[in-house]
Amino acid sequence: MALADSTRGLPNGGGGGGGSGSSSSSAEPPLFPDIVELNVGGQVYVTRRCTVVSVPDSLLWRMFTQQQPQELARDSKGRFFLDRDGFLFRYILDYLRDLQLVLPDYFPERSRLQREAEYFELPELVRRLGAPQQPGPGPPPSRRGVHKEGSLGDELLPLGYSEPEQQEGASAGAPSPTLELASRSPSGGAAGPLLTPSQSLDGSRRSGYITIGYRGSYTIGRDAQADAKFRRVARITVCGKTSLAKEVFGDTLNESRDPDRPPERYTSRYYLKFNFLEQAFDKLSESGFHMVACSSTGTCAFASSTDQSEDKIWTSYTEYVFCRE
């Protein structure tokens, strides 16, 4: 009977130790998988668990070392969910991989990224984002046509300009030889300062193109004189660089069809929250844009192919191209 008891792993039997060990191991919390899927604000990231726990005492480190998987929020597909900025999280994840901060030359979301780093409790990343930017090797920031602090609101340095050293006895009003060299063309003739594609002549606004389009309908025939048959515009679309479109149209720009588009990328899926072409023209004009081209196509639909006396319903698609130099 004692042998039978030990075989069954009773507390007083010889197999009790094995049964107790099995019970304790089953009581341990389940481990996280080596490959972790994260849903951050609708953006899905797949990474290794060792990456997200690479910074001790951070928010992600506590989530994936001090908590159990069932305690964390998940989406409908079982991915761990974080209600944060999905676009900026890519830079957080890049930092966690090798603890290095690498940002694009033109990055207007620096302050928002610093706020995300504070949320994820990454003090070293917060410190680096808050420190003044130091010019790296290669061309100076002014030759790359970027902002002083990587922000939309900061002043652009004219291309070819560098801070001249104040020479002893030099007049404060004397022209800088650096500026004189920057204003000359390679052939020796006088020329304006060289510009990057995103910098305008006044050094404060970026150049570029914006195309707005709309699909409209109107009637030609007996009802053409009625007020109800005037131009009808269903939606005004906006195509161009994301940062330019946001600068011109601001809160009147609907980004729902192309969210989290980086500022340096282009899009053709934005549209305006209003339907008045002249309002769009006014906003473009106030921002320094002028029209350089337009095109239109139209089709006609008959109510009956045999009865030509019926009113003709026309639909058209029109695009206007605006430029700021």
From Swiss-Prot:
Entry-linked SUPFAM superfamilies: POZ domain
GO BP term, pick one: regulation of G protein-coupled receptor signaling pathway
> Matching PANTHER family, A to Z?
BTB_POZ DOMAIN-CONTAINING PROTEIN KCTD12, POTASSIUM CHANNEL TETRAMERIZATION DOMAIN-CONTAINING
Location of Phosphotyrosine modifications: 119
| Tissues of expression | Present in a variety of fetal organs, with highest expression levels in the cochlea and brain and, in stark contrast, is detected only at extremely low levels in adult organs, such as brain and lung.
Question: What subcellular compartments does it reside in?
Answer: Presynaptic cell membrane; Postsynaptic cell membrane
- Tell me the Gene3D superfamilies matching this sequence: Potassium Channel Kv1.1, Chain A
Q: Which domain of life is it from?
A: Eukaryota
Q: Which CDD domains match?
A: H1_KCTD12
Q: Does the keyword Lipoprotein apply?
A: no
The modified positions for Phosphoserine read 151, 171, 185, 200
Is ATP-binding among the key words of this record? no
From the UniProt record, which GO molecular function terms apply? Answer: identical protein binding; RNA binding
Q: Assembly state and interactors?
A: Interacts as a tetramer with GABBR1 and GABBR2.
Q: What keywords appear on the UniProt entry?
A: Acetylation, Cell membrane, Cell projection, Membrane, Phosphoprotein, Postsynaptic cell membrane, Synapse
Protein name, entry field: BTB/POZ domain-containing protein KCTD12
Mark the residues carrying the PTM Phosphothreonine.
196
Q: Where is this region: Disordered?
A: 1-28, 129-202
Q: Which residues in this protein are found as N-acetylalanine?
A: 2
An example GO CC term for this entry is: cell projection
Give the compositionally biased regions (Gly residues). 11-21
User: What does this protein's UniProt record list under function?
Assistant: Auxiliary subunit of GABA-B receptors that determine the pharmacology and kinetics of the receptor response. Increases agonist potency and markedly alter the G-protein signaling of the receptors by accelerating onset and promoting desensitization.
